[in-house]
């Protein structure tokens, strides 16, 4: 992406990653594991760092350190995604958990999650944001949206508008601190 983004008007020095649900999980994992060969087979020498991450309603702790914060996700993940159980291969589940990779080098994060999410419990975002704030040297913003459900931003609404506006403001601040002009 960094090698080609300039051809399309983008700035290779300011790449931001985002995603919702599984994309929230994967974007967080990618943001926290730049340059780790195990996560980028075939392009181990490529700079995969990002300037910021903005995950929406993601799963951040697959091993469920909070007890009950995965509410049935373990069965789905073991059958369809990881293809092994947590009991049989805890190390692999840890490696796939963004919270396991939180550290001082984490990029700025803006985590968004709804309180009424029935797919991914809000406790996932709370504990992830707390872990980031406790260890990262960069800004960490957490927006917990009252009564918002999973995928709250799919349909246009006032809530979606405000969430998008908040993300835009966050990225403008990160961009200005990153040394780039804000749009």
Feature map (PLM): residue ranges:
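Alpha/beta-hydrolase superfamily serine-hydrolase fold, recognizing
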Residues: 1-183
């Amino acid at each position: 992406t960094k090698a080609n983004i300039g051809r399309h008007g983008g700035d290779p020095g300011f790449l931001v990653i985002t995603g919702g649900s599984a994309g929230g999980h994967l974007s967080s994992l990618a943001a926290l594991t730049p340059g780790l060969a195990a996560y980028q087979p075939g392009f181990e020498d490529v700079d995969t760092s990002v300037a910021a991450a903005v995950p929406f309603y993601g799963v951040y702790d697959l091993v469920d350190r909070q007890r009950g914060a995965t509410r049935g996700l373990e069965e789905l993940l073991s059958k369809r995604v990881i293809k092994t159980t947590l009991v049989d291969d805890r190390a692999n589940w840890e490696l796939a958990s963004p919270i396991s990779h939180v550290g001082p080098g984490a990029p700025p994060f803006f985590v968004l999650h709804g309180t009424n999410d029935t797919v991914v419990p809000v406790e996932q975002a709370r504990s992830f944001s707390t872990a980031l704030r406790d260890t990262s040297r960069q800004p960490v913003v957490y927006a917990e949206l009252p009564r918002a459900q999973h995928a709250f931003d799919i349909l246009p609404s006032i809530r979606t508008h405000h969430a998008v506006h908040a993300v835009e403001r966050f990225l403008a601040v990160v961009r200005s601190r990153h040394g780039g002009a804000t749009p």
